[in-house]
């Protein structure tokens, strides 16, 4: 387990609720972070924004000896203490369980009973590039769920949980424990925790500039092309827009 990582404050998480994933992606690209968008991971409950800190869980292909390794007590007697339970117990308000299932969207990482623990821990949500069993039931808990799919199958014949709060991949991108996980209608973006505060103001300004462009071009009936890339005219209409907000 990683001993220490940057824990982004709840106040910063709250701020990102109103920032678009596309804007965050653009700001990260400027800094050389190109692989931060998860492939094949989509919301099972469209319309639910997700912002939270990653608690990571890694799955491996199943094998009998791995089953023996990860099951530490009382299997089948209510005391199955695998790493999946460790990950769920590690959650706190503002955290997101992020499970690396090697892109196996048809393989379950858990179902409605297991993932009820996310609700009782008051965590922010669930992200996995694997599948979610009983997905239609899990989304009734009300938290955001982003996954590679919904499936009726159980996972154990194919995968087993292996380790918690270590760097993982999910949807083909790196997720470090504590990274900020952002989910919207476009999918899931991973914001490195050390950059969360640094890029926030630039993200807000970018969204404001684009809103100013949209309002101006709609009002005047002109093409947005005159304001991209951002230029002196862009700055002019942005300042006018900003003044109207104050």
At which residue positions do the language-model features occur?
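N-terminal low-complexity or amphipathic/hydrophobic leaders
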Residues: 5-78
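Short, charged beta->alpha transition segments
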Residues: 43, 77-90
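Extracellular/luminal Protease-associated
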Residues: 86-129
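Acidic/histidine-enriched, glycine/proline-rich intrinsically disordered or flexible terminal extensions
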Residues: 8, 220-246
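A hydrophobic, small-residue-rich beta->alpha segment in the mid-to-C-terminal subdomain
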Residues: 180-221
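Buried hydrophobic positions in well-ordered alpha/beta secondary-structure cores of metabolic enzymes
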Residues: 28, 118, 179-181
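A contiguous pocket-lining binding segment that forms or flanks enzyme active sites
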Residues: 128-129, 135-183
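General beta-strand structural signal in soluble alpha/beta enzymes
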Residues: 36-39, 98-100, 126-130, 147, ...
């Amino acid at each position: 387990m990683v001993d220490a990582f940057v824990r982004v404050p709840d106040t910063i998480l709250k701020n990102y609720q109103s920032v678009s994933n596309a804007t965050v992606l653009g700001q990260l690209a400027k800094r050389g972070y190109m692989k931060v968008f998860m492939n094949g991971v989509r919301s099972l409950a469209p319309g639910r924004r997700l912002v939270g800190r990653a608690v990571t869980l890694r799955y491996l292909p199943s094998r009998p000896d791995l089953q023996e390794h990860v099951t530490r007590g009382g299997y089948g007697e209510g005391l199955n203490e695998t790493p999946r339970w460790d990950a769920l117990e590690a959650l706190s308000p503002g955290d997101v369980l992020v499970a690396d299932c090697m892109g196996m969207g048809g393989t379950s990482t858990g179902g409605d009973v297991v993932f009820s623990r996310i609700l009782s821990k008051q965590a922010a949500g669930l992200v996995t590039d694997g599948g979610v069993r009983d997905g239609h039931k899990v989304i009734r808990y009300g938290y955001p769920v982003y996954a590679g799919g919904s499936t009726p199958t159980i996972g154990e014949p194919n995968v087993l949980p292996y380790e918690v709060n270590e760097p993982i991949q999910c949807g083909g991108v790196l997720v470090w424990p504590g990274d900020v996980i952002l989910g919207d209608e476009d999918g899931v973006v991973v914001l490195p925790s050390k950059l969360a505060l640094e890029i926030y103001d630039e993200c807000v300004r970018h969204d404001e500039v684009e809103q100013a462009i949209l309002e101006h071009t709609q009002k005047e009936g002109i093409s947005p092309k005159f304001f991209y890339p951002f230029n002196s005219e862009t700055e002019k209409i942005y300042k006018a827009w900003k003044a109207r907000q104050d």
